[in-house]
């Protein structure tokens, strides 16, 4: 399998996932080459430019796709940045942490950009980008809060789930403190309820580094 075939397969899987999420048909791009015309879905073409999309709910399928693309792009060039574009309401904490750990694990810097909404785990991953390379578009909204969860069953089962949620809350607060420079105590207070921010407010808070009105 050639490099282009692998790129196509990775991005086509993502395109299919986005269609499954109800985002409609995926546009195609036609390029001319010495061998004639070649058609790419738009995500395959952007993956060639080292752009990865995280759109919609953060779940195991999303995480698997993003992780696979990050690892592939590292193998292609470990010294060139990867861009992660985020428009997500959040979702699974475990899936989000899988993406976070991979972002830290790979050698290339991962720059992050919020387009539209980065909430919950979406905001967490936005803030987890390389320092100095985290940004948002002017009308983006960013929201942080504590992990959500529910439990059913015997009292002992509910107690176990409650301990796990408290552990995850402490772990996420610690990481947010590291990436924002805010004290853990302040993070805990500010995430007690849904906390919405504009791009400029997110810069002041340390979640991102800049608001981009136009590509530089």
From Swiss-Prot:
Enzyme class: hydrolase
Localization: Cytoplasm
GO molecular function: ATP-dependent peptidase activity; ATPase binding; serine-type endopeptidase activity
EC number(s) recorded for this UniProt protein: 3.4.21.92
Keywords: Cytoplasm, Hydrolase, Protease, Serine protease
Highest taxon, organism lineage: Bacteria
Catalysis: reaction(s): Hydrolysis of proteins to small peptides in the presence of ATP and magnesium. alpha-casein is the usual test substrate. In the absence of ATP, only oligopeptides shorter than five residues are hydrolyzed (such as succinyl-Leu-Tyr-|-NHMec, and Leu-Tyr-Leu-|-Tyr-Trp, in which cleavage of the -Tyr-|-Leu- and -Tyr-|-Trp bonds also occurs)
Signal sequence bounds: none
GO biological process, one term: protein quality control for misfolded or incompletely synthesized proteins
Pfam family, one: CLP_protease
PROSITE patterns referenced in this protein's UniProt entry, alphabetically: CLP_PROTEASE_HIS (PS00382), CLP_PROTEASE_SER (PS00381)
InterPro entries, alphabetized: ClpP, ClpP/crotonase-like_dom_sf, ClpP/TepA, ClpP_His_AS, ClpP_Ser_AS
Active site per the UniProt annotation: 120, 145
TM stretches of this protein: none
One GO CC annotation: cytoplasm
Protein family (similarity comment): Belongs to the peptidase S14 family.
Physiological role: Cleaves peptides in various proteins in a process that requires ATP hydrolysis. Has a chymotrypsin-like activity. Plays a major role in the degradation of misfolded proteins.
Subunit structure: Fourteen ClpP subunits assemble into 2 heptameric rings which stack back to back to give a disk-like structure with a central cavity, resembling the structure of eukaryotic proteasomes.
Record protein name field: ATP-dependent Clp protease proteolytic subunit
Gene behind the chain: clpP
């Amino acid at each position: 399998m050639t490099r282009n075939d692998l790129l196509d397969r990775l991005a086509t899987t993502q395109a299919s996932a986005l269609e499954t999420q109800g985002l409609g048909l995926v546009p195609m791009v036609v390029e001319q080459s010495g061998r004639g015309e070649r058609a790419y879905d738009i995500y395959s073409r952007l993956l060639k430019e080292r752009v990865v999309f995280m759109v919609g709910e953060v779940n195991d399928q999303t995480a698997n796709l993003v992780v696979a693309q990050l690892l592939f792009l590292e193998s292609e060039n470990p010294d060139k940045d990867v861009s992660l574009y985020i428009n997500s309401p959040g979702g699974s904490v475990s899936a989000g942490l899988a993406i976070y750990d991979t972002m830290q694990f790979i050698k290339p810097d991962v720059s992050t950009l919020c387009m539209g909404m980065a909430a919950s785990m979406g905001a967490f991953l936005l803030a987890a980008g390389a320092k100095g390379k985290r940004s948002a578009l002017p009308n983006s909204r960013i929201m942080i809060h504590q992990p959500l969860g529910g439990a059913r069953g015997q009292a002992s089962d509910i107690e176990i789930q409650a301990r796990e949620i408290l552990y995850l809350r402490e772990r996420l607060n610690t990481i947010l403190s590291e990436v924002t420079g805010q004290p853990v105590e302040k993070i805990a207070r500010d995430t007690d309820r849904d906390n919405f921010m504009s791009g400029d407010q997110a810069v002041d808070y340390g979640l991102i580094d800049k608001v981009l009105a136009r590509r530089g």
